[in-house]
Amino acid sequence: MRLIQALSLCLALSLSLAAPPQHKEDHSHKGKPGGEGHKHELHHGAQLDRCKGIEFDAVAVNEEGVPYFFKGDHLFKGFHGKAELSNKTFPELDDHHHLGHVDAAFRMHSEDSPDHHDHQFFFLDNMVFSYFKHKLEKDYPKLISAVFPGIPDHLDAAVECPKPDCPNDTVIFFKGDEIYHFNMHTKKVDEKEFKSMPNCTGAFRYMGHYYCFHGHQFSKFDPMTGEVHGKYPKEARDYFMRCPHFGSKTTDDHIEREQCSRVHLDAITSDDAGNIYAFRGHHFLSITGDKFHSDTIESEFKELHSEVDSVFSYDGHFYMIKDNDVFVYKVGKPHTHLEGYPKPLKDVLGIEGPVDAAFVCEDHHVVHIIKGQSIYDVDLKATPRKLVKEGTITQFKRIDAAMCGPKGVTVVIGNHFYNYDSVQVMLMAKIMPEQQKVSQQLFGCDH
């Protein structure tokens, strides 16, 4: 009997020693959506899919304007692509603080404060980290109260508000329904009430607008008053992510998404009749006069399926380049896929893929192909076709899409486009042309 008791005691002790300790760290805080607190789960081995509807912990842009979306210990860079561990880019977050989540983040825009301008700030519990060009600044991390006196710990969101959007260079902090405007020069804090806004779980400034994320939706707001104008909230996956299919939408919903999406274009072209076709992910937008149409690429170009690298129009046909293949469709209703295609890009145009953009200008038979900063010409009437380098683009490191029309060459980079009178002007230009917004000036989005 005593032997059995002794064995039982040994077994109990071994189990208690083997059992992992419970993680007692609590990041919940009052006022967060979802009850008593908003829990940040650890996802170290998780495969996160932002198209399934993720509530992000923080959103910010880097010094090159690329959005960073944080969830748990993961980070999404840009509008598409897989998540990666945050400590791959910001290793010190783990060195100084076991990284379970980032509470809030923003990139400082304050030209009057060179010590802070273009720095990225990350907030974890009661600490703040300052990075410049992905390197942790000396003496960081610091207590939030030391850098931003009067601002509470365990924040929900933060966003910069530079002049003239705010009267002075300011940072707006969110915690539950409490809003704090922090003046970067005087260190003064003004508490405000944004009655028409939901509680933000993330916030960021993008293309001159201010966005509050709540769940997988967002609202555009006035940084001074918190007023939300227009039809909000909207679905974040429609405007800030490249997601093929989710939910049910009307025809108008599809058109508005493609008009107003902040995700960069993959390709754009204008046919012989002057109609514009813009391609993004799994969808395309066509503009005929003042009429818009949107659908999936697969619905009208089923052999292509989705995601093109570049498209150009020539002699009543679309030449659609994807990886190292060329698909050709005769323009019409419906568009007709030509037999024998796809063919290798090398055989058709004499260049290896991938390419960034391609276009033919009116009444010409030369296709201009952009790859990196190089631009090549191919005479489409020549047999065999020969690739000739025309020049080097010096004003941009990379181009997302380009087309040529009555107004000259349109170059698309991210959410902006630039017009040049001709290819030669683009190659020789010393002064940057006016920067215009794709969603508004090109596609007529009203928000």
Swiss-Prot record:
UniProt signal peptide: 1-18
Coiled coil: none
Region entry Disordered, spans: 20-44
Start and stop residues of the Hemopexin repeats: 53-93, 99-151, 152-197, 198-243, 262-304, 305-351, 352-395, 396-441
GO molecular function annotation: heme transmembrane transporter activity; metal ion binding
Keyword terms of this UniProt record: Glycoprotein, Heme, Iron, Metal-binding, Repeat, Secreted, Signal, Transport
Biased composition (Basic and acidic residues): 22-44
Localization annotation: Secreted
Annotated binding of heme, by residue: 293
Glycosylation sites: 87, 168, 199
GO biological process: cellular response to estrogen stimulus; intracellular iron ion homeostasis
GO cellular component: collagen-containing extracellular matrix; extracellular space
SUPFAM superfamilies named in the record: Hemopexin-like domain
Family classification: Belongs to the hemopexin family.
Function, in words: Binds heme and transports it to the liver for breakdown and iron recovery, after which the free hemopexin returns to the circulation.
Protein name: Hemopexin
Organism for this UniProt entry: Danio rerio
Gene that encodes it: hpx
